[in-house]
Curated annotation (Swiss-Prot):
Keywords assigned: Calcium, Cytoplasm, Developmental protein, Disease variant, Fertilization, Hydrolase, Lipid degradation, Lipid metabolism, Nucleus, Transducer
Entry EC number(s): 3.1.4.11
Residue ranges constituting the PI-PLC X-box domain according to the UniProt record: 155-299
Domain-related comment: The EF-hand and C2 domains are essential for triggering Ca(2+) oscillating activity and the regulation of PLCZ1 enzyme activity.
Originating organism: Homo sapiens
Active site: H170, H215
Function: The production of the second messenger molecules diacylglycerol (DAG) and inositol 1,4,5-trisphosphate (IP3) is mediated by activated phosphatidylinositol-specific phospholipase C enzymes. In vitro, hydrolyzes PtdIns(4,5)P2 in a Ca(2+)-dependent manner. Triggers intracellular Ca(2+) oscillations in oocytes solely during M phase and is involved in inducing oocyte activation and initiating embryonic development up to the blastocyst stage.
BP-aspect Gene Ontology terms: calcium ion transport; egg activation; intracellular signal transduction; lipid catabolic process; positive regulation of cytosolic calcium ion concentration; positive regulation of cytosolic calcium ion concentration involved in egg activation
Protein name: 1-phosphatidylinositol 4,5-bisphosphate phosphodiesterase zeta-1
Top EC class for this record: hydrolase
Length: 608
């Protein structure tokens, strides 16, 4: 039956005799079989018996079977098939219930899966599934490790903004290093497409009264401020409906700040939040209440109430140039380190700052006594790390009330990143990373914000929100640990190493990131000279004390005996977004690009 179906699909392509490598690749695509060209090329070479660069229909069938008929899938199929040829709908339902932990399962659902994935018409009409169909199902999105429920916004989005982790970028305009690299609109577009909700804009006076964006006092190139916000306007809500915060690093004169205010209002129109929401006069609004809104984060003159009362009056009337105004209106005069040059705030720009007023962090005690609900702090990673070790309870209390942004230290001229996990552990909402720099920190960032539909907002765990909680990530005294078991079964079409001596020698590392006690990793043995279908069949167990903060990272490396192991691909996701059962893990490159069909095949089980 399968042979008849197979021949009916391919025989027309062999009417002219043999086919070459390119036609082989196209025929596999026609059959909906995903295979990377580099692996097809090698398998083609191995099965071209006459070594003429052309293969027969029988040789193509051998290639097809090598690619699609994986031993580990056949073993599962045979376990549930009564005759090792087909699965009845009841057999499939049993598999989904017992192995895939399907909460709701019936023959009707099994019928739907059969209709969707079974390619052989007569088998499909009989409400049965062949190995061909089962293989296609196991290779589908429905069997990915990442839960379908987490692909949509499922969390309560009506909490105040300070109750969420918010995807945030640092120096968003840069696509390289911070001294000589180019400033590029792609930095903003790329970040927004990835779900970033807080963008940094470094603003300076430009020629012809046009503010520019670049890394000040460096040789990085410049962008017009109005061009930057036009790009943001175009892409702001392409990935997520929830609010975007524009974090202004404002070095402009009052005259060019007024130009900035005009540009913001002209570009964003009604999307720009320029006054308090009626329902939130003294608390931060929720992401839900701020859908499709742009928020400006900057220094501000006076209070929200004063701004609200001033609305409708001439916003160009007073730029607060007089030094005597400083006592009445805090934030008018700023000093940069030991320099005496003061920066004045244009009232027109100040009035656009509503719920995200930038306020210098002084101390936790000062914040408790004086900080207003709409005031946000930005703290450098070095100071934040020191505070998190010496005053962790105060830090967590602070992040329960106020939006806190953590940014990379100034010495990271190469745009490198810190590990964001240590600051998520204490509830910091905006942990700002250099999105242009690939590596472990961005893998964690991308993995964490896969959750909640990639919306860029993730509700913090209750113990980082509730005032009665005494959570300390370094001293876990209570909670409900999870025992996570992962059987790493096999790899599927893994990338090849660049080494000429050990191509195809691969291993997998499984890492856990979370509170300090949960940080751990384990790795498989090396499989030699088989990147196409390595079989490990190794089982690993992890005890995870705070699963709400845990991320799991799978890393595939090529063994390197002299220069060290070579990174080949990775996948990171929140522990609580992992499906149980037999699952496929897609791999991504260091730059975050999909390496499909390269993937891992695992069996996952966990209990709390």
């Amino acid at each position: 039956m399968e042979m008849r179906w197979f021949l009916s699909k391919i025989q027309d392509d062999f009417r002219g005799g043999k086919i070459n490598l390119e036609k082989t690749q196209r025929l596999l695509e026609k059959l909906d079989i995903r295979c990377s060209y580099i692996h097809v090329k090698q398998i083609f070479k191995d099965n071209d018996r006459l070594k003429q660069g052309r293969i027969t229909i029988e040789e193509f069938r051998a290639i097809y079977r090598i690619i699609t008929h994986r031993e580990e899938i056949i073993e599962i199929f045979n376990t549930y098939s009564e005759n090792r040829k087909i699965l009845l709908a009841s057999n499939l339902a049993q598999f989904l219930t017992q192995e895939q932990y399907a909460a709701e399962m019936s023959k009707a659902i099994a019928f739907e899966i059969i209709q969707k994935y079974e390619p052989i018409e007569e088998v499909r009409k009989a409400h049965q599934m062949s190995l061909e169909g089962f293989t296609r199902y196991m290779d589908s999105r429905e069997c990915l490790l990442f839960k379908n429920e987490c692909r949509k916004v499922y969390q309560d989005m009506t909490h105040p903004l300070n109750d969420y982790f918010i995807s945030s970028s640092h120096n968003t305009y840069l696509v390289s290093d911070q001294l000589l690299g180019p400033s590029d609109l792609w930095g903003y577009v790329s970040a927004l497409v990835k779900g970033c909700r807080c963008l940094e804009i470094d603003c300076w006076d430009g020629a012809q009264n046009e503010p520019v964006v670049y890394h000040g006092y460096t040789l990085t190139s410049k962008l017009l401020f109005k061009t930057v916000i036009q790009a943001i306007h175009k892409y702001a809500f392409m990935t997520s409906d929830y609010p975007v915060v524009l974090s202004l690093e404002n070095h402009c004169s009052t005259a060019q700040q007024e130009v900035m205010a005009d540009n913001l209002q002209a570009t964003f129109g009604e999307s720009l939040l320029s006054d308090m929401l009626d329902d939130f006069p003294d608390t931060l609004p929720s992401p839900e209440a701020l859908k499709f809104k742009i928020l400006v984060k900057n220094k501000k003159i006076g209070t929200l109430k004063e701004t609200h009362e001033r609305k409708g009056s001439d916003k160009r009337g007073d730029n607060q140039d007089k030094e005597t105004g400083v006592k009445k209106l805090p934030g008018v005069m700023l000093f940069k380190k030991k320099k005496t040059r003061k920066l004045k705030i244009a009232l027109a720009l100040s009035d656009l700052v509503i719920y995200t007023k930038a306020e210098k962090f002084k101390s936790f005690q000062h914040s408790r006594l004086y900080q207003q609900f709409n005031e946000n702090n930005s703290i450098g990673e070095t100071q934040a790390r020191k505070l998190s070790k010496l005053r962790v309870h105060e830090f967590i209390f602070h992040t329960r009330k106020f939006i806190t942004r953590i940014y990379p230290k100034a010495t990271r001229a190469d745009s490198s990143n810190f590990n964001p996990q240590e600051f998520w552990n204490i509830g910091c909402q905006m942990v700002a990373l250099n999105f242009q720099t690939p590596g472990l920190p961005m893998d964690l960032q991308n993995g964490k914000f896969l959750d909640n539909g990639g919306s860029g907002y993730i509700l913090k765990p209750h113990f980082l929100r509730e005032s009665k909680s005494y959570f300390n990530p370094s001293n876990i005294k209570e909670g409900m640990p999870i025992t996570l078991t992962i059987r790493l079964i096999s790899g599927i079409q893994l990338p090849l190493t660049h080494s000429s001596s050990n191509k195809g020698d691969s291993l997998v590392i499984i890492e856990v990131f979370g509170v300090p006690n949960d940080q751990m990793k384990q790795q498989t043995r090396v499989i030699k000279k088989n990147a196409f279908s390595p079989r490990w069949n190794e089982t690993f167990t992890f005890i995870i004390h705070v699963p709400e903060l845990a991320l799991i990272r799978f890393v595939v490396e090529g063994q390197g005996l002299i220069a060290g192991n070579e990174f080949l691909g990775q996948y990171t996701l929140p522990l609580l977004c992992m499906n149980k059962g037999y699952r496929r893990i897609p791999l991504f490159s260091r730059m975050g690009e999909s390496l499909e069909p390269a993937s891992l095949f695992v069996y996952v089980w966990y209990v709390r």
